[in-house]
Swiss-Prot record:
Cited Gene3D superfamilies: P-loop containing nucleotide triphosphate hydrolases
Places the protein is found: Cytoplasm; Cell membrane
Membrane-protein topology: Peripheral membrane protein
Name of the protein in question: Rac-like GTP-binding protein ARAC4
Keywords: Cell membrane, Cytoplasm, GTP-binding, Lipoprotein, Membrane, Methylation, Nucleotide-binding, Prenylation
Length: 195
């Protein structure tokens, strides 16, 4: 039996770690230099909960220069991984201000996995000494944002340590294979019509 193809597209501000997350997941390595979106589309068979799927990963550039091109990669997406950096308040705020309106416009109804990246830096005291303007985003703030945008799942990860990186992509696959049940509207059985 052929495995199901799932198109997974990563979206979010530039420099939040989307490409690093993809490289960490697919090659178990962490690029030490900032490389703006050089991840080629990637496809591999992945087994999650006994189901084999062909996972297609698409990277996008978050920079404004790509605002007109980026939506072309949304076509046919089964799930979005919407990323912000846990050490960048601006990237967190842009989830609701920029990315959700864009995704809802170009790909309404496609499930979203909300991901907080750079988890290793959130508790790194030296990072905040070196970057006094940086404001960490808490897990509670991430959970609140998940509810606000209607995301299926919220996960925090570190591509550098690989903490929860596999969990991000497993969640993306699961939300496609087992979509959350929609709340059914109660039907009024005691209806009558006057003619």
């Amino acid at each position: 039996m052929a495995s199901r193809f799932i198109k997974c597209v990563t979206v979010g501000d530039g420099a939040v770690g989307k490409t690093c997350m993809l490289i960490s997941y697919t090659s178990n390595t962490f690029p030490t230099d900032y490389v703006p979106t050089v991840f080629d589309n990637f496809s591999a068979n992945v087994v999650v909960d006994g189901n084999t799927v062909n996972l297609g990963l698409w990277d996008t550039a978050g920079q404004e220069d790509y605002n007109r091109l980026r939506p072309l990669s949304y076509r046919g997406a089964d799930v979005f991984i919407l990323a912000f950096s846990l050490i960048s308040k601006a990237s967190y705020e842009n989830i609701a201000k920029k990315w959700i309106p864009e995704l809802r416009h170009y790909a309404p109804g496609v499930p979203i996995i909300l991901v907080g990246t750079k988890l290793d830096l959130r508790d790194d005291k030296q990072f905040f000494i070196d970057h006094p303007g940086a404001v960490p985003i808490t897990t509670n703030q991430g959970e609140e944002l998940k509810k606000l945008i209607g995301s299926a799942v919220y996960i925090e990860c570190s591509s550098k340590t690989q903490q929860n990186v596999k969990a991000v992509f497993d969640a993306a696959i699961k939300v496609v294979l087992q979509p959350p049940k929609q709340k059914k509207k109660k039907k009024n059985k005691n209806r009558c019509a006057f003619l």
